[in-house]
């Protein structure tokens, strides 16, 4: 028993020690002065250069997914798409030529934000059910905390938000915090899309303008083993910003026991 207690104590000490260290490393100054390179980004660890790279890609309308400071697969996909759009050599890492194009946006990639009454008003869920059948009885698939809502609002992971704001109270209106700035002073609206390319194999969505130039990129989860997405040329006939999910029992999703159709309310906006 003593060994288990001692091991647990060591784990807790290590976790507490890692928190301040990570926060110090991911300071606004460190992030804004960082230079992404093969050595300064990591798929396993959040780094200042990883944060800056992800934010600049997001500003350019080439989404790396959730901004967490890590150079994971979604960030890699976004970087490749950005290089393609800029007619630069394909890049799996932030090469000098690609970074030169991205860093033309010289605005800081973070900004100060004061938490509002609306941010903390809720209502918040105690816990989001893991099973689909349990979700159908919830009036709205909301967030579980102000911290989760704030992270989503600024395209960030909760872990990165916490690392940038050690000791801050995310439940208190008026609290000043640091967030990543995916808007940026120079960001404008993307050109109007004329064509959408959904790649089921690469799990990506690309938007092209009338001149066939790539203007927007998103990583995406497309279809599943139970419900394959259609192939071919389709036409967008309707856009729903708050869609209701409708479960069809004919697909027999894993983990879903219901033999009757049901709906799941829209999530937060």
Predicted regions and their residues:
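Bacterial N-terminal signal peptides that target proteins for export
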Residues: 1-9
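N-terminal signal peptide c-region/cleavage motif recognized by signal peptidases
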Residues: 18-19
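Short N-terminal segments immediately surrounding and downstream of signal-peptide cleavage
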Residues: 24-42
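Primarily a LysM-type cell-wall glycan-binding module
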Residues: 43-77, 119-155
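Extracytoplasmic
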Residues: 52, 62, 74, 97, ...
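N-terminal post-signal-peptidase region of extra-cytosolic proteins
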Residues: 64, 147, 158-166, 179-194, ...
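Extracellular LysM carbohydrate-binding repeats and other cell-envelope/extracellular binding modules
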Residues: 73-119, 162-195
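Gly/Pro-biased beta-strand-loop elements
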Residues: 189-269
């Amino acid at each position: 028993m003593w060994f288990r207690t001692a091991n647990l104590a060591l784990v807790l000490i290590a976790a507490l020690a890692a928190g301040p260290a990570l926060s110090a490393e991911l300071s606004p100054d460190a992030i804004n002065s960082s230079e992404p390179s093969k050595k300064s980004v990591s798929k396993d660890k959040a780094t200042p250069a990883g944060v800056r790279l992800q934010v600049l890609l997001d500003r350019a309308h080439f989404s790396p997914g959730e901004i967490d400071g890590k150079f994971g697969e979604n960030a890699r996909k976004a970087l490749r798409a950005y290089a393609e759009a800029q007619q630069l050599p394909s890049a799996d890492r932030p090469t000098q030529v690609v970074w030169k194009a991205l860093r033309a946006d010289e605005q800081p990639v973070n900004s100060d934000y004061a938490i509002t009454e609306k941010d903390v008003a809720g209502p918040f869920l105690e816990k989001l059910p893991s099973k689909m059948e349990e979700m159908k009885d919830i009036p709205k698939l909301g967030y579980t905390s102000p911290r989760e809502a704030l992270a989503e609002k600024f395209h960030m992971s909760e872990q990165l938000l916490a690392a940038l704001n050690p000791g801050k109270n995310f439940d208190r209106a008026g609290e000043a915090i640091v967030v990543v700035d995916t808007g940026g002073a120079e960001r404008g609206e993307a050109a109007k899309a004329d064509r959408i390319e959904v790649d089921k194999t690469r799990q990506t969505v690309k938007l092209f303008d009338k001149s066939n130039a790539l203007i927007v990129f998103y990583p995406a989860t497309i279809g599943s083993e139970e419900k394959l997405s259609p192939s071919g040329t389709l036409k967008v006939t309707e856009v729903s910003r708050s869609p209701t999910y409708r479960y069809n029992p004919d697909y027999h999703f894993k983990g879903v026991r219901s033999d009757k159709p049901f709906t799941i309310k829209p999530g937060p906006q």
